[in-house]
Amino acid sequence: MDIIPAIDLLGGRCVRLYQGDYNQAEVFDTDPVGMARRWLSQGATRLHLVDLDGAKTGEPVNQAAMAAIVQDLAIPVQVGGGVRSRQRVVELLDLGVDRVILGTVAIEQPQLVEALCAEFPGRILIGIDARDGKVATRGWLETSTVQATDLARTVEKAGAAGIIYTDIHRDGTLQGPNLEALRQLASEVNLPIIASGGVSSIADLLNLFVLSTSGVTGVIIGKALYSGDITLTDAIRAVGQGRWQDVPPDLGFSTFA
């Protein structure tokens, strides 16, 4: 399972929101590049960047910070937040971003999403942010009437590379992921699903790992890493590539006679 640290940018700073509430932004660091290097040093193989300002305005706001991270690190970076045009997708890919996350446009401009998936195969992820099962848009400030499962089926047909599923009520709360919603989503589509929101412990990660055979291939961790409830190293050892259970014990002798 891919363990992906999150860096959410608001006003150039690394923050975490509580249930998507911008008024409850908690600042954890003022040096995004330094934070990215920290996660890299602890074993990160991919980063998840979100321009929270951009998610609200629909325009790039934290471009300088994101560019600095992408250019400084030699690991893949996925970026979302206010990406609502082909031009913006091209700008991010030209910058060196590995995958671009589309959210609001998946609801408002499905034809654009289909066209982008066709033009950039394997590079477009869809962020499905759900509030009580319905998809939220525009930085989670609005809630549509579209069910998350319905959107998932639509973007699968459009050719998306995968889905990032966030339960807004769990995000930033450390209350554990919504396993039932993830299980249901995974049963509806044949796409890689990355879980996001609520992870607070190694136990939560192990519960998610059980769903890996159903299509939940990764997890984005934010608040728990910043608060110290989980270390990235321990998370990777528990459910990441080369996890403890995948490494045979060193018995001090060969088992082959």
From Swiss-Prot:
CDD domains: HisA (cd04732). Belongs to the HisA/HisF family. It catalyses: 1-(5-phospho-beta-D-ribosyl)-5-[(5-phospho-beta-D-ribosylamino)methylideneamino]imidazole-4-carboxamide = 5-[(5-phospho-1-deoxy-D-ribulos-1-ylimino)methylamino]-1-(5-phospho-beta-D-ribosyl)imidazole-4-carboxamide. Pathway: Amino-acid biosynthesis; L-histidine biosynthesis; L-histidine from 5-phospho-alpha-D-ribose 1-diphosphate: step 4/9. Coiled coil: none annotated. This is 1-(5-phosphoribosyl)-5-[(5-phosphoribosylamino)methylideneamino] imidazole-4-carboxamide isomerase. One of its GO terms (molecular function) is 1-(5-phosphoribosyl)-5-[(5-phosphoribosylamino)methylideneamino]imidazole-4-carboxamide isomerase activity. Its main location: cytoplasm. The active site is at residues 8, 129. It is found in: Cytoplasm.
